Every structure is written in structure tokens, then in C-alpha cells.
């Protein structure tokens, strides 16, 4: 088993049309590199997993429990499990790195 991975060449999973992720996981955490195309929204949703992340490219609007912010590279967020949230990009695409705990089994592929 290797302890190192590269994002390039890793299989993608479509979240919604125009948004996809590449994931890596251990026993208790899952790392998700999310890419969202311009003019695309990951609609309001919830999951039982705690989610922490950081925007690494572009800008995206994120709403968490009714609080809405425009996030830029370097902006971070923490979303408790069960809290409704969404993300959307305007005229430019965006990329974020998310961490989930516990591991989201549906993201293991």
C-alpha cells in the first residue's frame, strides 16, 4: 500500500452535472477535491458527516444554514453534520478541497 496519491489520473465521480470530485480516504476521514464548472450549482443538501473545506481556485457562493458568503481562494468553512448547505459558481469555475468525517461510504469508488 502506498501512502501517497496524485489527483491527476484519479477517477472522477459526478456530483451533479457540471460538478465532480476525486476522493481519497483513510479509516476515519475522506478527502474530496471538488471542481465546479462556471454557472453550476451543487444544490441545497445535507448529510450526517462533518465537512471542512477550503476554496483553492476561483470564487464560489456558499450558503450554510441560511448564511451566504462569497468565498475566494484561501477562505475556509466548517459545516456540522445535518446542516443544510449549497455551493455555486458564477461566471468562472471553482475548486475546493473538502474533508469529511466520518468517511462518506458513497464517495469510496
Where are these regions (language model features)?
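Histidine-centered metal-chelating micro-motifs
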Residues: 41-42, 61, 77, 81-86
